[in-house]
């Protein structure tokens, strides 16, 4: 994920990558102290949503105090982090845009609290997620939210990490510029609109 943060920074964004596993690892360690992904997932599961949102809010607040900050902030995440991006769009005042890569949309009560544009990506070879992202579109429209999404054919979960499977590399080449353009649209200029679209 550090490589992704670096790619965002190269686009001119201030990027903070909070370690939501800080203090949860062996001997109080962080993300890097977990040897196995399953152990990391279990540890993260012990942290409540309010705790995670608090860590994300603290990272955002820190970023906004940096000299180059323009007063706007966005959030992106991948898998569980993609779900946190959805949650943050609802729970953190002052977030201006959210991009979710293969993250689960929230429940309707949380969705109703979303105040910012959301962009979501998924692959149709991710049967536990793709239908949920597609189902979020009419709900977001009904709620008057600005929502864009793209579900890629023959693409798996975590497609940015698994480039050799199916059409994952194609999805990566398409989704990344879309995410950058989305952030530039909502973080660099005053924009007020409500729409739901896929293309």
Question: Each predicted region: which residue ranges?
Answer:
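Serine-hydrolase catalytic machinery in alpha/beta-hydrolase-like enzymes
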Residues: 1-65, 161
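Short alpha-helix in the alpha/beta-hydrolase fold that links the catalytic acid
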Residues: 3-4, 130-140
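Short beta-to-alpha linker loops that shape the active-site pocket of alpha/beta-hydrolase fold enzymes
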Residues: 20-24, 104, 155
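Primarily recognizes the serine-hydrolase "nucleophile elbow" in alpha/beta-hydrolase
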Residues: 53-115
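Short beta-strand/loop motif that positions the catalytic acidic residue
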Residues: 114, 120-122
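Acidic catalytic loop of the alpha/beta-hydrolase fold
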Residues: 125-130, 157
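C-terminal catalytic histidine-bearing segment of alpha/beta-hydrolase fold enzymes
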Residues: 141-199
